[in-house]
Amino acid sequence: MSKKLHIKTWGCQMNEYDSSKMADLMDEYKGYTLTEEAEEADVLLLNTCSIREKAQEKVFHQLGRWKKLKDKNPNLIIGVGGCVASQEGKVIKDRAQCVDLIFGPQTLHRLPEMIDQIEAGGKAVIDVSFPEIEKFDRLPEPRADGPSAFVSIMEGCSKYCSFCVVPYTRGEEVSRPLDDVILEIAQLAEQGVREVNLLGQNVNAYRGATHDDEICTFAELLRYVAAIDGIDRLRFTTSHPIEFTQDIIDVYEDTPELVSFLHLPVQSGSDRILTQMKRGHMAIEYKSIIRRLRKARPDIQVSSDFIIGFPGESKQDFEDTMKLIEDVQFDHSFSFIYSARPGTPASDLPDDVTLDEKKERLAILQDRITQQAMRYSRQMLGTVQRILVEGPSVKNPMELRGRTETSRVVNFEADPKHIGSFVDVEIVDVYTNSLRGNFIRGEDEMDLRRSLRPSDILAKHKKDDELGVTQYIP
């Protein structure tokens, strides 16, 4: 009988991606199968996130529950990974004696060897090092789980915003080689994946090495991926305004596979607070990016992250944020009350905005974003939207569920044969968290793009050398 693995994941999409790779590794090298029930597992893995307040205590509460399982089964192996493990590994081991292994985001590829060591009776293992891109060299071939897939193109961040722990828990920016990224996506496309979401803490800082020792920019990578046969929808997250350059905006103008939706975190609309956060840009520069984007792609929708109650945030600072929200007309946001992260520069600042003020401002901001999102949804009434069908509807398994380019869930009635493909639906009703549609046509009635080689795409974009001679670089 195969052994069983249970993984509990907290945090961002990068953590979700990492957890899927842990499962693949444990299956490929150890023969473990996933289980949803911790009580059935031989190995329990907790993939942690350090972004939210009291992240460390949340870890210990979960480990306390798992300790009871280990008391009943001394052979049970418990591991802690992710950003809290990277930041607080020794503290976890000292406080939770039930933990057998602790590993960071950059060492999850060593998981099978760590398990071998524990199964052989070895001592607890702690490995929270930063071995650069080695992690991706050791991962097994990707396995598709539905028509949409995440693909990590880089790790870490080198921006060192004053509030953020990512550079300390995931290391500085390291890009995967171009060929590795393209191969993984091509393998997923062969398994039926139609939509790819490129992942990284700061994807637009991507600088991947090519086979001929050149550097591939993020804009060039987008065009390469869009040219892969079978990939008809392309997303990416997350990006930083200071590296959202014109060449990336140009991709929106000529690459229909790239969706009309962008998550571009701004955090605050106050120049004073942005400076305190060490974001490297002002509010007007952010708005300039959005204006140029909407010139290239008029129907693009934008979402953002906001931190409420950063140290020193005055009422005027908050009003500046609300003014930015009004000017940009965000479609969605991830908004958080500020809480100091240990070891960050901002943690040395006085947390002088009261909790009641933070909660009040958060409610005001979220209400405004919700109103704007509902207005966008209502504008879709009567329109025909192309959606990627993900599977049965959550509330009614006799119906289907898909997503628009702007990530809105649409429920509709149609033949299950359409799961995994694109369909056109007319939007007939709008709800707070979803849309209702009527099926119009399936993929066999659509005029989808013809297959193109990557060189066909890139050859359209000229480059001038230092002498001013125009070259076309395939």
Curated annotation (Swiss-Prot):
Entry binding sites for [4Fe-4S] cluster 1: 12, 49, 83
Domain MTTase N-terminal: 3-120
Keywords: 4Fe-4S, Cytoplasm, Iron, Iron-sulfur, Metal-binding, S-adenosyl-L-methionine, Transferase, tRNA processing
Keyword check for Iron: yes
Pfam families (alphabetical): Radical_SAM, TRAM, UPF0004
Domain of life: Bacteria
Entry-linked InterPro entries: Elp3/MiaA/NifB-like_rSAM, Methylthiotransferase, Methylthiotransferase_CS, Methylthiotransferase_N, Methylthiotransferase_N_sf, MiaB_methiolase, rSAM, rSAM_horseshoe
Major localisation: cytoplasm
Keyword Ribosomal protein set for record: no
GO molecular function: 4 iron, 4 sulfur cluster binding; metal ion binding; N6-isopentenyladenosine methylthiotransferase activity
Record-listed [4Fe-4S] cluster 2 binding positions: 157, 161, 164
Similarity remark: Belongs to the methylthiotransferase family. MiaB subfamily.
Subunit note: Monomer.
Record's protein name: tRNA-2-methylthio-N(6)-dimethylallyladenosine synthase
Upper taxonomic lineage: Bacteria, Pseudomonadati, Pseudomonadota, Gammaproteobacteria, Alteromonadales
